[in-house]
UniProtKB/Swiss-Prot annotation:
This is GMP synthase [glutamine-hydrolyzing] subunit A. InterPro entries: Class_I_gatase-like, GATASE, GMP_synth_GATase, GMP_synthase_A. It comes from Methanococcus maripaludis (strain C6 / ATCC BAA-1332). It is an enzyme of class 6 (ligase). Keywords: ATP-binding, Glutamine amidotransferase, GMP biosynthesis, Ligase, Nucleotide-binding, Purine biosynthesis. One of its GO terms (cellular component) is cytosol. Its EC number is 6.3.5.2. GO terms for molecular function: ATP binding; GMP synthase activity. Residues 1-189 form the Glutamine amidotransferase type-1 domain. The active site is at 76 (nucleophile), 163, 165. SUPFAM superfamilies: Class I glutamine amidotransferase-like.
Length: 189
């Protein structure tokens, strides 16, 4: 099972639905849920930190990002929280918008396996990661944001600024499936 921490974003139920389409069980929990409560359930194989409107109301997510031994994926605000937890810098975007953008994948990696080096995604850019922590590598960027996706260099911790769970994002299902594979789920190819 994947647990989705609800940071108040409008797409949190869409994340759960996208996982259901992949036949991956998932449940939504409040962002006040602790890592200890999550790992007490032996069925949980991965954590998704959802998007949301307010980074100051989701600080429990930082502890999860720092201490989880199971894979973590941060989406939008979740991505920013992961970066902030490890010492990255998050601030207002230069180009504040909610729109379709082109994502450029730097090189094939485990999160973007089977995804072309250039694809269209739906993204929110009110705030964004400006400086990536040293223990992370940048996986993807766009014309308006230099840090569209990150991965911890040693742990299975990922972040994406864009929304893979919405239909406007090409290959979003592939990206979510790749994360689920890191969590130990298997799929027929």
């Amino acid at each position: 099972m994947i647990v989705i921490l609800n940071n108040g974003g409008q797409y949190v139920h869409r994340i759960q639905r996208s996982l259901k389409y992949l036949e991956v069980p998932a449940k939504i929990v409040p962002n006040s849920t602790t890592l200890e409560e999550i790992i007490a359930d032996s069925e949980i194989k991965g954590i998704i930190l959802s998007g949301g409107p307010d980074i100051t109301k989701a600080t429990n997510c930082e502890n999860i990002a720092l201490n989880s031994e199971i894979p973590v994926l941060g989406i939008c605000l979740g991505h920013q929280l992961i970066s902030k937890a490890y010492g990255g810098h998050v601030s207002r975007a230069d180009s504040e918008e909610y729109a379709s953008i082109t994502i450029y994948v730097k090189e094939e990696n485990d999160l973007f396996k089977g995804v072309p080096s250039k694809f269209t995604a739906w993204a929110s850019h009110m705030d964004e990661v400006k400086v990536t922590p040293g223990c992370f590598e940048i996986l993807a960027y766009s014309d308006i944001c230099g840090v569209e996706s990150i991965k911890h260099k040693e742990k299975s911790i990922y972040g994406v600024q864009f929304h893979p769970e919405v239909s406007h994002t090409e290959y979003g299902d592939v990206i979510l499936k790749n994360f689920c594979k890191k969590c130990g789920f298997e799929f027929e190819e």
